[in-house]
Protein backbone atom coordinates (compact mmCIF):
# COMPACT_ATOMS: atom_id res chain seq x y z
CA UNK A 1 0.00 0.00 0.00
CA UNK A 2 1.24 3.47 -0.80
CA UNK A 3 0.09 7.07 -0.61
CA UNK A 4 -0.57 8.95 -3.83
CA UNK A 5 -1.31 12.68 -3.91
CA UNK A 6 -3.61 13.71 -6.75
CA UNK A 7 -5.36 16.86 -7.89
CA UNK A 8 -7.49 18.13 -10.73
CA UNK A 9 -8.48 15.64 -13.41
CA UNK A 10 -6.06 12.86 -12.49
CA UNK A 11 -7.45 9.51 -13.65
CA UNK A 12 -7.87 6.75 -11.08
CA UNK A 13 -8.86 3.09 -11.24
CA UNK A 14 -9.13 -0.09 -9.19
CA UNK A 15 -5.87 -1.28 -10.82
CA UNK A 16 -7.32 -4.50 -12.21
CA UNK A 17 -9.73 -5.80 -14.80
CA UNK A 18 -12.41 -8.44 -14.56
CA UNK A 19 -10.72 -11.85 -14.76
CA UNK A 20 -11.94 -13.46 -17.97
CA UNK A 21 -9.87 -16.56 -17.22
CA UNK A 22 -7.20 -18.17 -19.35
CA UNK A 23 -8.03 -19.96 -22.58
CA UNK A 24 -7.19 -23.21 -20.80
CA UNK A 25 -9.70 -22.42 -18.03
CA UNK A 26 -12.41 -21.43 -20.50
CA UNK A 27 -11.83 -24.62 -22.49
CA UNK A 28 -12.01 -26.72 -19.30
CA UNK A 29 -15.30 -25.10 -18.29
CA UNK A 30 -16.84 -25.67 -21.71
CA UNK A 31 -15.76 -29.31 -21.50
CA UNK A 32 -17.37 -29.73 -18.08
CA UNK A 33 -20.62 -28.18 -19.27
CA UNK A 34 -20.77 -30.42 -22.35
CA UNK A 35 -20.05 -33.50 -20.24
CA UNK A 36 -22.88 -32.64 -17.82
CA UNK A 37 -25.26 -31.99 -20.73
CA UNK A 38 -24.33 -35.38 -22.20
CA UNK A 39 -24.02 -37.61 -19.12
CA UNK A 40 -26.00 -35.81 -16.42
CA UNK A 41 -25.67 -37.20 -12.90
CA UNK A 42 -22.76 -39.47 -13.80
CA UNK A 43 -20.74 -36.47 -14.96
CA UNK A 44 -21.61 -34.44 -11.86
CA UNK A 45 -20.54 -37.38 -9.65
CA UNK A 46 -17.25 -37.80 -11.48
CA UNK A 47 -16.39 -34.10 -11.27
CA UNK A 48 -17.35 -34.00 -7.57
CA UNK A 49 -14.88 -36.81 -6.89
CA UNK A 50 -12.22 -35.13 -9.04
CA UNK A 51 -12.49 -31.57 -7.75
CA UNK A 52 -13.96 -31.88 -4.24
CA UNK A 53 -12.52 -35.24 -3.23
CA UNK A 54 -15.99 -36.38 -2.17
CA UNK A 55 -17.81 -39.52 -3.20
CA UNK A 56 -21.45 -38.49 -2.95
CA UNK A 57 -23.94 -41.31 -3.50
CA UNK A 58 -26.91 -38.98 -3.89
CA UNK A 59 -26.68 -35.27 -4.61
CA UNK A 60 -29.84 -34.19 -2.89
CA UNK A 61 -29.62 -33.36 0.81
CA UNK A 62 -31.97 -35.51 2.86
CA UNK A 63 -34.32 -34.42 5.64
CA UNK A 64 -32.11 -36.37 8.03
CA UNK A 65 -29.07 -34.31 7.01
CA UNK A 66 -31.00 -31.10 7.65
CA UNK A 67 -32.00 -32.37 11.11
CA UNK A 68 -28.34 -33.22 11.80
CA UNK A 69 -27.35 -29.70 10.77
CA UNK A 70 -29.75 -28.20 13.31
CA UNK A 71 -28.33 -30.48 16.00
CA UNK A 72 -24.76 -29.50 15.15
CA UNK A 73 -25.44 -25.75 15.11
CA UNK A 74 -25.04 -23.76 18.31
CA UNK A 75 -28.35 -22.27 19.47
CA UNK A 76 -26.88 -18.77 19.50
CA UNK A 77 -25.70 -19.16 15.90
CA UNK A 78 -29.20 -20.17 14.84
CA UNK A 79 -30.65 -17.15 16.65
CA UNK A 80 -28.19 -14.88 14.81
CA UNK A 81 -29.23 -16.37 11.46
CA UNK A 82 -32.90 -15.88 12.35
CA UNK A 83 -32.30 -12.25 13.34
CA UNK A 84 -30.45 -11.60 10.08
CA UNK A 85 -33.32 -13.19 8.12
CA UNK A 86 -35.78 -10.77 9.73
CA UNK A 87 -33.66 -7.73 8.83
CA UNK A 88 -32.98 -8.85 5.26
CA UNK A 89 -36.63 -9.74 4.59
CA UNK A 90 -37.84 -6.44 6.02
CA UNK A 91 -35.54 -4.50 3.69
CA UNK A 92 -36.28 -6.50 0.55
CA UNK A 93 -40.04 -6.41 1.03
CA UNK A 94 -39.81 -2.66 0.36
CA UNK A 95 -38.43 -3.41 -3.11
CA UNK A 96 -41.40 -5.50 -4.19
CA UNK A 97 -42.90 -4.15 -7.42
CA UNK A 98 -46.56 -4.70 -8.31
CA UNK A 99 -48.52 -4.65 -11.55
CA UNK A 100 -50.06 -1.34 -12.62
CA UNK A 101 -52.61 -0.19 -15.20
CA UNK A 102 -54.08 3.10 -16.40
CA UNK A 103 -56.81 4.24 -18.78
CA UNK A 104 -56.83 7.01 -21.37
CA UNK A 105 -59.88 9.07 -22.20
CA UNK A 106 -60.34 7.20 -25.49
CA UNK A 107 -60.86 3.91 -23.63
CA UNK A 108 -57.36 2.53 -24.11
CA UNK A 109 -55.97 0.54 -21.19
CA UNK A 110 -52.20 0.22 -20.79
CA UNK A 111 -50.17 -1.35 -18.05
CA UNK A 112 -47.34 -3.48 -16.80
CA UNK A 113 -47.85 -6.97 -15.39
CA UNK A 114 -45.30 -8.16 -12.83
CA UNK A 115 -44.69 -11.92 -12.70
CA UNK A 116 -42.13 -13.80 -10.59
CA UNK A 117 -39.73 -16.26 -12.19
CA UNK A 118 -40.85 -19.88 -11.93
CA UNK A 119 -37.51 -21.06 -10.54
CA UNK A 120 -34.10 -19.88 -9.37
CA UNK A 121 -30.86 -21.67 -8.55
CA UNK A 122 -28.61 -20.30 -5.83
CA UNK A 123 -24.94 -21.24 -5.80
CA UNK A 124 -23.22 -21.08 -2.40
CA UNK A 125 -19.43 -21.57 -2.18
CA UNK A 126 -18.41 -24.36 0.17
CA UNK A 127 -15.82 -27.04 0.74
CA UNK A 128 -13.44 -25.77 3.43
CA UNK A 129 -15.53 -22.65 4.12
CA UNK A 130 -19.17 -21.97 4.97
CA UNK A 131 -21.22 -18.98 3.83
CA UNK A 132 -24.72 -18.97 5.32
CA UNK A 133 -24.85 -15.24 4.55
CA UNK A 134 -24.75 -16.10 0.83
CA UNK A 135 -27.81 -18.31 1.36
CA UNK A 136 -29.74 -15.45 2.95
CA UNK A 137 -28.73 -12.75 0.48
CA UNK A 138 -29.57 -14.81 -2.61
CA UNK A 139 -32.63 -16.72 -1.43
CA UNK A 140 -34.55 -13.96 0.37
CA UNK A 141 -35.01 -11.65 -2.67
CA UNK A 142 -36.30 -14.64 -4.65
CA UNK A 143 -38.71 -15.57 -1.86
CA UNK A 144 -40.04 -12.02 -1.58
CA UNK A 145 -40.45 -11.87 -5.37
CA UNK A 146 -42.67 -14.95 -5.21
CA UNK A 147 -40.42 -17.51 -6.93
CA UNK A 148 -42.08 -20.90 -6.44
CA UNK A 149 -39.04 -23.16 -6.75
CA UNK A 150 -35.70 -22.20 -5.25
CA UNK A 151 -32.83 -24.66 -5.60
CA UNK A 152 -29.54 -24.46 -3.71
CA UNK A 153 -26.23 -26.00 -4.80
CA UNK A 154 -23.02 -26.03 -2.77
CA UNK A 155 -19.84 -28.13 -3.01
CA UNK A 156 -19.45 -30.75 -0.26
CA UNK A 157 -16.44 -31.19 1.97
CA UNK A 158 -14.34 -34.33 1.64
CA UNK A 159 -16.76 -36.00 4.07
CA UNK A 160 -19.53 -35.51 1.53
CA UNK A 161 -21.44 -33.07 3.73
CA UNK A 162 -22.46 -29.43 3.59
CA UNK A 163 -21.91 -27.06 6.49
CA UNK A 164 -24.48 -26.96 9.26
CA UNK A 165 -24.78 -23.18 8.90
CA UNK A 166 -25.59 -23.34 5.19
CA UNK A 167 -28.16 -26.13 5.63
CA UNK A 168 -29.84 -24.45 8.60
CA UNK A 169 -30.00 -21.08 6.82
CA UNK A 170 -31.62 -22.74 3.79
CA UNK A 171 -34.08 -24.70 5.92
CA UNK A 172 -35.07 -21.57 7.87
CA UNK A 173 -36.10 -20.05 4.53
CA UNK A 174 -38.04 -23.12 3.47
CA UNK A 175 -35.53 -24.25 0.85
CA UNK A 176 -35.36 -28.04 0.86
CA UNK A 177 -34.20 -28.77 -2.70
CA UNK A 178 -30.50 -28.69 -1.89
CA UNK A 179 -27.77 -30.42 -3.89
CA UNK A 180 -24.26 -31.36 -2.85
CA UNK A 181 -22.43 -30.23 -5.97
CA UNK A 182 -20.16 -27.34 -6.81
CA UNK A 183 -18.05 -25.69 -9.48
CA UNK A 184 -18.83 -25.50 -13.18
CA UNK A 185 -20.61 -28.86 -12.99
CA UNK A 186 -23.19 -27.44 -10.56
CA UNK A 187 -23.84 -24.44 -12.80
CA UNK A 188 -24.27 -26.76 -15.79
CA UNK A 189 -26.67 -29.03 -13.88
CA UNK A 190 -28.77 -26.05 -12.78
CA UNK A 191 -28.85 -24.59 -16.29
CA UNK A 192 -29.45 -27.73 -18.35
CA UNK A 193 -30.76 -30.22 -15.82
CA UNK A 194 -29.94 -33.90 -15.29
CA UNK A 195 -31.98 -37.06 -14.85
CA UNK A 196 -32.97 -35.91 -11.36
CA UNK A 197 -32.46 -32.13 -11.43
CA UNK A 198 -34.96 -29.92 -13.25
CA UNK A 199 -33.29 -26.87 -14.84
CA UNK A 200 -33.90 -23.41 -13.37
CA UNK A 201 -34.61 -20.05 -15.00
CA UNK A 202 -31.95 -17.99 -13.23
CA UNK A 203 -28.69 -18.68 -11.39
CA UNK A 204 -27.26 -16.38 -8.74
CA UNK A 205 -24.44 -16.55 -6.23
CA UNK A 206 -20.67 -16.09 -5.99
CA UNK A 207 -17.91 -18.56 -6.77
CA UNK A 208 -14.37 -19.04 -8.03
CA UNK A 209 -13.15 -18.37 -11.56
CA UNK A 210 -14.61 -21.67 -12.83
CA UNK A 211 -18.04 -20.83 -11.44
CA UNK A 212 -17.84 -17.33 -12.95
CA UNK A 213 -16.82 -18.69 -16.35
CA UNK A 214 -19.57 -21.31 -16.23
CA UNK A 215 -22.17 -18.64 -15.46
CA UNK A 216 -20.90 -16.65 -18.43
CA UNK A 217 -21.18 -19.74 -20.66
CA UNK A 218 -24.76 -20.64 -19.67
CA UNK A 219 -26.09 -17.08 -19.86
CA UNK A 220 -28.80 -17.08 -22.49
CA UNK A 221 -29.89 -20.58 -21.59
CA UNK A 222 -30.69 -19.07 -18.19
CA UNK A 223 -30.41 -15.62 -16.69
CA UNK A 224 -27.62 -14.86 -14.21
CA UNK A 225 -27.11 -12.19 -11.58
CA UNK A 226 -23.67 -10.85 -12.53
CA UNK A 227 -20.06 -11.84 -13.12
CA UNK A 228 -18.53 -10.57 -9.90
CA UNK A 229 -14.83 -10.00 -9.35
CA UNK A 230 -12.79 -9.78 -6.14
CA UNK A 231 -14.19 -7.69 -3.30
CA UNK A 232 -13.55 -3.94 -3.01
CA UNK A 233 -13.84 -1.24 -0.40
CA UNK A 234 -13.29 2.49 -0.76
CA UNK A 235 -13.36 4.76 2.26
CA UNK A 236 -14.00 8.49 1.93
CA UNK A 237 -12.67 10.18 5.06
CA UNK A 238 -11.73 13.56 6.45
CA UNK A 239 -9.45 14.52 9.33
CA UNK A 240 -12.14 13.70 11.92
CA UNK A 241 -12.11 9.97 11.10
CA UNK A 242 -10.50 7.37 13.37
CA UNK A 243 -7.40 5.95 11.67
CA UNK A 244 -7.55 2.67 13.61
CA UNK A 245 -11.12 2.01 12.47
CA UNK A 246 -10.26 2.87 8.88
CA UNK A 247 -7.33 0.44 8.92
CA UNK A 248 -9.54 -2.30 10.35
CA UNK A 249 -12.19 -1.73 7.69
CA UNK A 250 -9.64 -1.77 4.86
CA UNK A 251 -8.29 -5.08 6.15
CA UNK A 252 -11.80 -6.53 6.44
CA UNK A 253 -11.87 -6.66 2.64
CA UNK A 254 -8.20 -7.49 2.14
CA UNK A 255 -8.58 -10.79 4.00
CA UNK A 256 -11.22 -11.94 1.48
CA UNK A 257 -8.90 -12.46 -1.45
CA UNK A 258 -5.35 -11.72 -2.56
CA UNK A 259 -6.90 -9.64 -5.37
CA UNK A 260 -9.30 -7.69 -3.13
CA UNK A 261 -8.95 -3.93 -3.38
CA UNK A 262 -8.82 -1.60 -0.35
CA UNK A 263 -8.66 2.14 -1.03
CA UNK A 264 -8.76 5.23 1.18
CA UNK A 265 -9.57 8.62 -0.34
CA UNK A 266 -8.99 11.60 1.96
CA UNK A 267 -8.14 15.28 1.97
CA UNK A 268 -5.97 14.82 5.07
CA UNK A 269 -2.33 13.84 4.57
CA UNK A 270 -1.95 13.34 8.32
CA UNK A 271 -4.77 10.80 8.34
CA UNK A 272 -3.31 9.06 5.29
CA UNK A 273 0.06 8.56 6.96
CA UNK A 274 -1.52 7.30 10.20
CA UNK A 275 -3.72 4.81 8.33
CA UNK A 276 -0.79 3.49 6.30
CA UNK A 277 1.21 2.66 9.44
CA UNK A 278 -1.83 1.23 11.24
CA UNK A 279 -2.77 -1.09 8.36
CA UNK A 280 0.59 -2.85 8.50
CA UNK A 281 0.54 -2.95 12.30
CA UNK A 282 -2.89 -4.61 12.42
CA UNK A 283 -2.02 -6.87 9.52
CA UNK A 284 0.52 -8.79 11.58
CA UNK A 285 -2.17 -9.96 13.99
CA UNK A 286 -4.63 -11.39 11.44
CA UNK A 287 -5.12 -15.15 11.00
CA UNK A 288 -5.30 -14.62 7.21
CA UNK A 289 -2.43 -12.15 7.16
CA UNK A 290 -0.67 -13.63 4.11
CA UNK A 291 -3.76 -13.22 1.93
CA UNK A 292 -4.40 -9.75 3.36
CA UNK A 293 -0.77 -8.74 2.82
CA UNK A 294 -0.88 -9.67 -0.87
CA UNK A 295 -4.08 -7.68 -1.28
CA UNK A 296 -2.79 -4.62 0.56
CA UNK A 297 0.60 -4.67 -1.19
CA UNK A 298 -0.79 -5.11 -4.70
CA UNK A 299 -4.24 -3.52 -4.62
CA UNK A 300 -4.20 -1.23 -1.60
CA UNK A 301 -3.90 2.51 -2.16
CA UNK A 302 -4.40 5.82 -0.37
CA UNK A 303 -5.36 8.83 -2.48
CA UNK A 304 -4.78 12.26 -0.94
CA UNK A 305 -6.70 15.09 -2.60
CA UNK A 306 -6.57 18.84 -2.08
CA UNK A 307 -10.29 19.17 -1.36
CA UNK A 308 -13.22 16.98 -0.32
CA UNK A 309 -14.95 17.76 -3.63
CA UNK A 310 -11.98 16.23 -5.44
CA UNK A 311 -12.17 13.23 -3.13
CA UNK A 312 -15.83 12.72 -4.06
CA UNK A 313 -14.90 12.88 -7.75
CA UNK A 314 -12.32 10.15 -7.18
CA UNK A 315 -14.96 7.96 -5.53
CA UNK A 316 -17.36 8.42 -8.44
CA UNK A 317 -14.62 7.47 -10.89
CA UNK A 318 -13.76 4.34 -8.89
CA UNK A 319 -17.44 3.30 -8.60
CA UNK A 320 -16.56 0.91 -5.76
CA UNK A 321 -18.47 -2.15 -4.59
CA UNK A 322 -18.51 -0.88 -0.97
CA UNK A 323 -18.15 2.78 0.02
CA UNK A 324 -17.80 4.01 3.58
CA UNK A 325 -18.16 7.74 4.24
CA UNK A 326 -16.35 8.69 7.43
CA UNK A 327 -16.57 12.46 7.57
CA UNK A 328 -17.90 15.00 10.04
CA UNK A 329 -21.26 15.01 8.18
CA UNK A 330 -21.53 11.86 6.04
CA UNK A 331 -25.17 12.54 5.11
CA UNK A 332 -24.17 15.85 3.52
CA UNK A 333 -22.01 14.04 0.94
CA UNK A 334 -24.52 11.31 0.07
CA UNK A 335 -26.19 13.37 -2.65
CA UNK A 336 -22.87 13.82 -4.46
CA UNK A 337 -22.17 10.09 -4.69
CA UNK A 338 -23.30 8.77 -8.07
CA UNK A 339 -21.58 5.41 -8.36
CA UNK A 340 -21.24 2.83 -5.56
CA UNK A 341 -22.74 -0.59 -4.92
CA UNK A 342 -23.48 0.01 -1.24
CA UNK A 343 -22.90 3.18 0.78
CA UNK A 344 -22.17 3.06 4.52
CA UNK A 345 -22.65 6.33 6.40
CA UNK A 346 -20.75 7.05 9.61
CA UNK A 347 -18.40 5.16 11.91
CA UNK A 348 -21.03 2.72 13.18
CA UNK A 349 -21.88 1.57 9.66
CA UNK A 350 -18.77 -0.56 9.20
CA UNK A 351 -18.86 -2.63 6.00
CA UNK A 352 -19.36 -6.01 7.78
CA UNK A 353 -22.65 -4.61 9.15
CA UNK A 354 -23.94 -4.81 5.59
CA UNK A 355 -22.24 -8.11 4.82
CA UNK A 356 -24.28 -9.97 7.39
CA UNK A 357 -26.98 -8.17 9.25
CA UNK A 358 -28.33 -4.73 8.35
CA UNK A 359 -30.70 -5.83 5.58
CA UNK A 360 -29.49 -4.53 2.19
CA UNK A 361 -28.08 -7.15 -0.14
CA UNK A 362 -24.38 -7.91 -0.12
CA UNK A 363 -24.34 -9.18 -3.72
CA UNK A 364 -22.91 -6.04 -5.29
CA UNK A 365 -21.37 -4.90 -8.59
CA UNK A 366 -17.56 -4.93 -8.62
CA UNK A 367 -14.69 -3.58 -10.70
CA UNK A 368 -16.32 -0.25 -11.49
CA UNK A 369 -19.53 -1.81 -12.82
CA UNK A 370 -21.49 0.14 -10.19
CA UNK A 371 -21.48 2.81 -12.92
CA UNK A 372 -24.27 0.85 -14.61
CA UNK A 373 -25.21 -2.04 -12.29
CA UNK A 374 -27.13 -2.43 -9.03
CA UNK A 375 -27.10 -4.78 -6.04
CA UNK A 376 -29.05 -8.03 -6.29
CA UNK A 377 -32.66 -7.24 -5.45
CA UNK A 378 -36.25 -8.46 -5.62
CA UNK A 379 -36.81 -7.12 -9.14
CA UNK A 380 -34.03 -9.43 -10.39
CA UNK A 381 -36.45 -12.30 -9.77
CA UNK A 382 -39.44 -10.64 -11.43
CA UNK A 383 -40.41 -10.21 -15.09
CA UNK A 384 -42.38 -7.38 -16.64
CA UNK A 385 -44.96 -7.82 -19.39
CA UNK A 386 -46.39 -4.79 -21.20
CA UNK A 387 -50.20 -4.74 -21.43
CA UNK A 388 -52.00 -3.04 -24.34
CA UNK A 389 -55.79 -2.99 -24.73
CA UNK A 390 -56.63 -0.53 -27.52
CA UNK A 391 -60.22 0.67 -27.78
CA UNK A 392 -62.12 0.93 -31.09
CA UNK A 393 -62.06 4.70 -30.79
CA UNK A 394 -58.29 4.81 -30.26
CA UNK A 395 -57.65 2.38 -33.10
CA UNK A 396 -59.70 4.32 -35.64
CA UNK A 397 -58.10 7.60 -34.56
CA UNK A 398 -54.53 6.29 -34.94
CA UNK A 399 -54.68 3.55 -37.59
CA UNK A 400 -53.54 5.80 -40.44
CA UNK A 401 -50.52 7.03 -38.45
CA UNK A 402 -49.55 3.48 -37.42
CA UNK A 403 -49.75 2.18 -40.99
CA UNK A 404 -47.70 5.14 -42.23
CA UNK A 405 -45.06 4.49 -39.57
CA UNK A 406 -44.83 0.84 -40.69
CA UNK A 407 -44.28 1.92 -44.30
CA UNK A 408 -41.65 4.41 -43.11
CA UNK A 409 -39.70 1.33 -42.00
CA UNK A 410 -40.50 -0.61 -45.17
CA UNK A 411 -42.73 -3.15 -43.42
CA UNK A 412 -45.77 -3.43 -45.68
CA UNK A 413 -47.32 -6.43 -43.89
CA UNK A 414 -47.39 -4.42 -40.67
CA UNK A 415 -49.29 -1.64 -42.42
CA UNK A 416 -51.75 -4.06 -44.02
CA UNK A 417 -52.43 -5.72 -40.65
CA UNK A 418 -53.71 -2.36 -39.45
CA UNK A 419 -55.61 -1.55 -42.63
CA UNK A 420 -57.36 -4.94 -42.67
CA UNK A 421 -59.13 -3.97 -39.46
CA UNK A 422 -60.06 -0.57 -40.82
CA UNK A 423 -61.67 -2.20 -43.87
CA UNK A 424 -63.68 -4.53 -41.63
CA UNK A 425 -64.90 -1.51 -39.70
CA UNK A 426 -66.04 0.39 -42.83
Curated annotation (Swiss-Prot):
Cofactor: record remark: Binds 1 zinc ion per subunit.
Pathway in which the depicted protein is active: Amino-acid biosynthesis; L-histidine biosynthesis; L-histidine from 5-phospho-alpha-D-ribose 1-diphosphate: step 9/9
GO cellular component term, pick one: cytosol
Q: Which residues bind Zn(2+)?
A: 253, 256, 355, 414
Q: Where does NAD(+) bind?
A: 123, 185, 208
Name the domain of life. Bacteria
Keyword Membrane appears in the UniProt entry: no
EC numbers listed for it are 1.1.1.23
Q: Which GO terms describe its molecular function?
A: histidinol dehydrogenase activity; NAD binding; zinc ion binding
Identify which top EC class this enzyme belongs to. Answer: oxidoreductase
InterPro entries, A to Z = Ald_DH/histidinol_DH, Histidinol_DH_CS, Histidinol_DH_monofunct, Hstdl_DH
Cofactor needs: Zn(2+)
Keywords, comma-separated and alphabetical: Amino-acid biosynthesis, Histidine biosynthesis, Metal-binding, NAD, Oxidoreductase, Zinc
Task: Please verify whether the record's keywords include Oxidoreductase.
Answer: yes
Q: What does this protein do?
A: Catalyzes the sequential NAD-dependent oxidations of L-histidinol to L-histidinaldehyde and then to L-histidine.
Q: What is this protein identified as? A: Histidinol dehydrogenase
Amino acid sequence: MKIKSISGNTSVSLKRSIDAGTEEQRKAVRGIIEEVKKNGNAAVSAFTRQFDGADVAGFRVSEEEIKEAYSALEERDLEIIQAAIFNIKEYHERQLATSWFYHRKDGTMLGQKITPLDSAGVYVPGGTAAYPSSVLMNVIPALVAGVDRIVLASPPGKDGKLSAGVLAAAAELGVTEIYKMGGAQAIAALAYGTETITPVDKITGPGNIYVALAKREVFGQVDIDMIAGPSEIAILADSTANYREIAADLLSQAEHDAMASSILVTDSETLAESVLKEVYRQLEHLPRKEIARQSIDNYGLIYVTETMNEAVSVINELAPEHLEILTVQPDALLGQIKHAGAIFLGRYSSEPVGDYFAGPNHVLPTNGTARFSSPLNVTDFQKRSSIISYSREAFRANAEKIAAFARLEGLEAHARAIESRNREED
